[in-house]
């Protein structure tokens, strides 16, 4: 192969030499040489008997056709060429576009808006922005960027660049890269970015209301707290982002990234990762990576990288490795994945509930705590995230990771998950209940109730209520994000990662590896990861993990194993009843 390439290159250069030497000659007409310069050439006598005196290719074509004009005609052609050349010269370099070092550039089919530096677009530093049906508006702690219908917008701590319909935009606190078919938007540093196909930010089909500060926000057509059937409302202590029906919105205490149509977004006290239907996402303590349906969006506290169509992206607190479609990393076909630090990892086909050190997260197919079929309400002590029907939402006291429909987290095909630190792990096919160091979490297929240390989350088919450590629903001590039916929302204390339909992303607190097509991602450091077929919520600073396709249990601090999901569920019924009773009051 190398020999073939070498011969091909040699022949190519020989051809160029012959062509340049014998095929063309420079324009030798002194009257035109100053206008055309060296970039205009004329054929040699081989094709032009007159050997070119101020003639252009168009003129030579006429000669090839047998036209032989007299000297007078040739002179008139030369004079015409002079006039044309002057016009051409006058038109050169007409348009130039520049932007400032700290400025934003946006483009896109039907409009894009982005900002950079420390500026806000379509909203204010600490202000809220809402928009209309198919509009996009977002804001961030200090910077906000919204974009249009199928466009993408991003901003960055220092610089921002957005692009159009099928373009990708990324930014990062320091560096950011994103891509994707129907692109995603990312931001980094202390900026917020939202996007979506028909996205909505801080708005909904029938509109929503958001506020900031330490206030509460409710909305929704039939919805519950922080969102409505097809609407979304969110607010945050400093940042707020909500989006509409099929949109994506994200914000973060410091960094937030959301992606597109059926993508998923997550948040975390410090790091959060959620993914979508068949996607995998993992996050890392300091870094963040997300991707979209077939697109990718990412941002990072420091650096961010996202990738495209069915690509994989990974990052890590220090190191991260993720792989692709049917690959596995940090786990094997029948292998298991553990979590790092003091965190636990759970998974399960339809299971899912975990909470974090001080935060609570629950979810369910048609439920509502931190997510629901069409409703969403979630909160967190510092960050809040809710999502819609097929979406995934997660938050965590410090770190949280959830994933989507058929995904697995930190575990393998037939494997189970263990817990760490001081946490217990229980699982079950259709019911999971786990709690963390000091938190309790319960969930079920169609009903979920979980609470955190100082948090409480309850849900119902069409109603939800969640609050945070000191916050009310749909808002967070610092940040709040809600989204709509098929939307994704994420925020993160410092870093956020979301990804899309069939994508994979992984990270690690120190080192993280995620894999495969229907595999899931694990996290490390002090992060938690949970997954489940159609709903997943997990967290864990010192958190609990539940897993198992058909139930698996891992040992807690005392090495106790829980294998029977039914018995475990029975043990939690009384707690669930008490929590529901308290919420009803």
From Swiss-Prot:
Alphabetized InterPro entries for the sequence: HPI-Adhesin/Ser-rich (IPR053118), S-antigen (IPR008825)
Gene Ontology CC terms, in alphabetical order: symbiont-containing vacuole
Chain positions of Sequence repeats: 102-109, 110-117, 118-125, 126-133, 134-141, 142-149, 150-157, 158-165, 166-173, 174-181, 182-189, 190-197, 198-205, 206-213, 214-221, 222-229, 230-237, 238-245, 246-253, 254-261, 262-269, 270-277, 278-285, 286-293, 294-301, 302-309, 310-317, 318-325, 326-333, 334-341, 342-349, 350-357, 358-365, 366-373, 374-381, 382-389, 390-397, 398-405, 406-413, 414-421, 422-429, 430-437, 438-445, 446-453, 454-461, 462-469, 470-477, 478-485, 486-493, 494-501, 502-509, 510-517, 518-525, 526-533, 534-541, 542-549
Subcellular location as annotated: Parasitophorous vacuole
Residue ranges with Acidic residues bias: 59-85, 117-129, 469-481
Region called Disordered, residue ranges: 51-585
Chain intervals for the UniProt region annotation (56 X 8 AA tandem repeats of E-D-[EK]-V-S-N-G-[RG]): 102-549
Pfam families in the record: S-antigen
Keyword terms, alphabetized: Malaria, Repeat, Signal
Ranges of Basic and acidic residues composition bias in the record: 96-113, 194-209, 218-233, 274-297, 322-337, 362-393, 402-417, 442-465, 530-553, 560-569
Segments of skewed composition (Low complexity): 576-585
Signal peptide boundaries: 1-23
Function description: S antigens are soluble heat-stable proteins present in the sera of some infected individuals.
Name of the protein this chain belongs to: S-antigen protein
Species per Swiss-Prot/TrEMBL record: Plasmodium falciparum (isolate 3D7)
Lineage start: Eukaryota, Sar, Alveolata, Apicomplexa, Aconoidasida
């Amino acid at each position: 192969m190398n020999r073939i390439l070498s011969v091909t290159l040699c022949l190519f250069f020989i051809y160029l030499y012959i062509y340049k030497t014998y095929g063309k000659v420079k324009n030798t007409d002194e009257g035109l040489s100053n206008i055309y310069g060296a970039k205009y050439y004329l054929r040699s006598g081989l094709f032009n008997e007159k050997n070119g005196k101020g003639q252009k290719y168009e003129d030579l074509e006429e000669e090839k056709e047998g036209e032989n004009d007299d000297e007078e005609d040739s002179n008139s052609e030369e004079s015409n060429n002079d006039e044309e050349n002057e016009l051409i010269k006058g038109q050169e370099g007409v348009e130039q576009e520049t932007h400032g070092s700290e400025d934003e550039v946006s483009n896109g089919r039907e409009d894009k808006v982005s900002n950079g530096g420390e500026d806000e677009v379509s909203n204010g530093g600490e202000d809220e922005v809402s928009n209309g049906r198919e509009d996009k508006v977002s804001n961030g702690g200090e910077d906000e960027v919204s974009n249009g219908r199928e466009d993408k917008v991003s901003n960055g701590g220092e610089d921002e660049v957005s692009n159009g319909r099928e373009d990708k935009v990324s930014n990062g606190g320091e560096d950011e890269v994103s891509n994707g078919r129907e692109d995603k938007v990312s931001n980094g540093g202390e900026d917020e970015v939202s996007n979506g196909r028909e996205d909505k930010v801080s708005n909904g089909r029938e509109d929503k209301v958001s506020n900031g500060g330490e206030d509460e926000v409710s909305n929704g057509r039939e919805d519950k707290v922080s969102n409505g059937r097809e609407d979304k409302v969110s607010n945050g202590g400093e940042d707020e982002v909500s989006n509409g029906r099929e949109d994506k919105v994200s914000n973060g205490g410091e960094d937030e990234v959301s992606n597109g149509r059926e993508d998923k977004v997550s948040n975390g006290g410090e790091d959060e990762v959620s993914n979508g239907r068949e996607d995998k996402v993992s996050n890392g303590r300091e870094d963040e990576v997300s991707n979209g349906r077939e697109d990718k969006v990412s941002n990072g506290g420091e650096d961010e990288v996202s990738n495209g169509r069915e690509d994989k992206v990974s990052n890590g607190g220090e190191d991260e490795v993720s792989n692709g479609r049917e690959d596995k990393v940090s786990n094997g076909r029948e292998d298991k994945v553990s979590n790092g630090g003091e965190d636990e990892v759970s998974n399960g086909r339809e299971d899912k509930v975990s909470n974090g050190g001080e935060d609570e997260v629950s979810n369910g197919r048609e439920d509502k705590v931190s997510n629901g079929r069409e409703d969403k309400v979630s909160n967190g002590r510092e960050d809040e995230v809710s999502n819609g029907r097929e979406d995934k939402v997660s938050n965590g006291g410090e770190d949280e990771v959830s994933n989507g429909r058929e995904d697995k987290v930190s575990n393998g095909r037939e494997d189970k998950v263990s817990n760490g630190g001081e946490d217990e792990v229980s699982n079950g096919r259709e019911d999971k209940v786990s709690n963390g160091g000091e938190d309790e979490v319960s969930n079920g297929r169609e009903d979920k109730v979980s609470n955190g240390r100082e948090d409480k989350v309850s849900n119902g088919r069409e109603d939800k209520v969640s609050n945070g450590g000191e916050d009310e629903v749909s808002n967070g001590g610092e940040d709040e994000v809600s989204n709509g039916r098929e939307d994704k929302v994420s925020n993160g204390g410092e870093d956020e990662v979301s990804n899309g339909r069939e994508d994979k992303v992984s990270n690690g607190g120190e080192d993280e590896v995620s894999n495969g097509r229907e595999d899931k991602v694990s996290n490390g450091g002090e992060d938690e990861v949970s997954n489940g077929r159609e709903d997943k919520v997990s967290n864990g600073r010192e958190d609990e993990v539940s897993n198992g396709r058909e139930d698996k249990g891992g040992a807690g601090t005392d090495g106790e194993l829980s294998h029977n999901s039914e018995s475990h569920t029975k043990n939690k019924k009384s707690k669930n009843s008490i929590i529901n009773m308290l919420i009803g009051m």
